[in-house]
Design a protein with these regions (language model features):
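Beta-hairpin "wing" of winged helix-turn-helix
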Residues: 73, 177-178
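Phosphate-backbone binding and catalysis cores of DNA-processing enzymes
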Residues: 1-151, 157
Length: 189
């Protein structure tokens, strides 16, 4: 067997994509991988379900609702799904990969003082909504508190908001959990 084919087959086996190595639950599937890319929210149940035997997309969403799985940025600028119990150590371990991103966030005016204020507003909001809030609800709360989440440049609409949410994920304040209307709600990390 040629080396590239062996490598490909080894990856398929290691990722739990064959019955012999498939996980028993969504939590096991994600923990076996440490982290699973999750940019496209609608594809997450299928990506996890493909690594489990007989698991429906609804069962994957139940794992998020129970707080077993979270969606966040534990490393670089790519959204990943991790287990809730692995999220914080992964986030801390991979913190060194944030330098370039932090420079860009600072250029958006995201000072430590602003981030701390935004974190407090988010935590206050989540105290009254422990099941989670949508991005729109969080951004609205920030607006009521005088925190501007809009960039001046029309070519960068949403970039400041994204950077602020991402910073609070990377700092371990927020993460995304249960799904409502196709959106992962923001919850207390």
């Amino acid at each position: 067997m040629e080396a590239p084919l062996r490598v490909s087959l080894g990856r398929i086996i290691a990722q739990g994509l064959v019955p012999a190595t498939a996980a028993r639950s969504p939590l096991d599937a994600v923990e076996n991988l440490a982290a699973l890319q999750g940019q496209q929210a609608s594809a997450i149940p299928w990506a996890i379900g493909a690594r489990c035997m007989g698991v429906s997309p609804a069962r994957v969403e139940e794992s998020f609702a129970r707080g077993e799985l979270v969606r966040s940025w534990p490393m670089r600028g790519t959204v990943h799904v991790t287990s809730a119990r692995d999220h914080h150590w992964l986030r801390r371990l991979l913190r060194h990969r944030r330098a370039a991103w932090e420079r860009q966030a600072l250029s958006q005016g995201l000072t430590d003082a602003l981030v701390e204020r935004a974190a407090q507003v988010a935590c206050d909001l989540l105290e009254t909504s422990p099941q989670g809030v949508s991005r729109a609800e969080l951004v609205e709360a920030w607006g009521r508190s005088g925190i501007d989440t809009v960039t001046a440049s029309s070519s960068q609409v949403g970039l400041r908001r994204r950077h602020l949410i991402m910073r609070l994920h990377l700092d371990g304040v927020l993460t995304a959990g249960p799904v409502r209307a196709g959106e992962h709600l923001i919850v207390d990390a």
